[in-house]
A protein has these predicted regions:
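RNA-binding basic/glycine-rich loop and surface signature characteristic of RAMP-family CRISPR effectors
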Residues: 1-126, 140-211
Length: 211
C-alpha cells in the first residue's frame, strides 16, 4: 500500500456544481453542512481519468514510448477489474487530520453563536456570485438573467490518495495525470476552473533519459 498527499490549488473562479438551487442562487456549488466548500472524490477521480487519457494521447502524438506507463483500465476499472485499487477521498480546505478538529470547533461556535457563525456566512467567505444573461439583438432577453456561485481563486484543497498493489508503471501514469490536470468545473472555455494539482509522487525519470 502507498499513500500520497495531493493538493488542488484553485487558480481562477471555479464552479463545482452541486446540482442544487434556491431562491437566491440558481446554481450552487458543493459544500458540507457547516458551509465549507470541498472537492468531491468522484469528480476528482473522473477528472484524473480524463487527464490520464490525454497523457497517453500526447505520448502517441509525440511518438514517445509508453511502455513505462500502465494501461488505464488496470487503474480505473472502467470495463473490467484488476488487483490495483486507487482510493480517492473528498478533498477539504485542510488535511483530513486537521479538518476533523477544525470542524468540531466550528460546530461548537455555530451551536453557541448560531446567528453569527452560519453555514451561509461561511460559504460566502469563500465564494462570490457571477451573473449572466442572454443577449438578443444586443438586448438582454427577458427572463434570461441568472447567477451561479463560484469558489474564489486562492483556495486550496488537500487529500491523501491510496494505491493498493501498484507498480512503477501505475505511479508513472498517476504522476503525469496529476501534473496534467489543470481545469475542472463548468465554463472552462471562459476562464473559469483553472487549477494546479501537486502530489508527492516521484516524477517519471524515464522522461529525462537521453535518446
Amino acid at each position: 500500500m502507498a499513500e500520497f498527499d495531493v493538493t488542488i490549488e484553485i487558480l481562477s473562479p471555479i464552479h463545482l456544481s452541486s446540482g442544487r438551487a434556491d431562491v437566491n442562487v440558481d446554481a450552487e456549488i458543493v459544500h458540507d453542512a457547516l458551509g465549507f466548500p470541498y472537492f468531491p472524490a468522484k469528480r476528482f477521480k473522473g477528472l484524473l481519468y480524463e487527464s490520464a487519457v490525454e497523457v497517453l494521447e500526447m505520448f502517441e502524438l509525440s511518438r514517445l514510448d509508453a511502455e513505462n506507463l500502465s494501461p488505464l483500465e488496470k487503474i480505473f476499472h472502467r470495463h473490467s477489474t484488476s488487483e490495483v485499487q486507487l482510493i480517492v477521498p473528498n478533498f477539504y480546505i485542510l488535511p483530513a487530520e486537521k479538518y476533523q478538529a477544525f470542524c468540531a470547533e466550528w460546530k461548537y461556535l455555530q451551536g453557541v453563536y448560531p446567528e453569527i457563525f452560519t453555514p451561509t456566512e461561511i460559504l460566502n467567505s469563500y465564494t462570490s456570485l457571477r451573473y449572466q444573461t442572454k443577449l438578443e439583438n444586443g438586448i438582454a432577453a427577458e427572463g434570461s438573467l441568472h447567477n451561479l456561485r463560484v469558489l474564489d481563486a486562492g483556495t486550496k484543497f488537500f487529500g491523501k490518495i491510496t494505491l493498493l498493489n501498484a507498480d512503477k508503471k501505475v505511479l508513472n501514469v498517476l504522476a503525469l495525470a496529476i501534473k496534467n490536470l489543470t481545469a475542472a468545473g463548468m465554463k472552462r472555455n471562459r476562464g473559469f476552473g483553472r487549477i494546479k494539482c501537486t502530489a508527492n509522487i516521484p516524477f517519471p525519470q524515464f522522461l529525462f533519459k537521453e535518446a
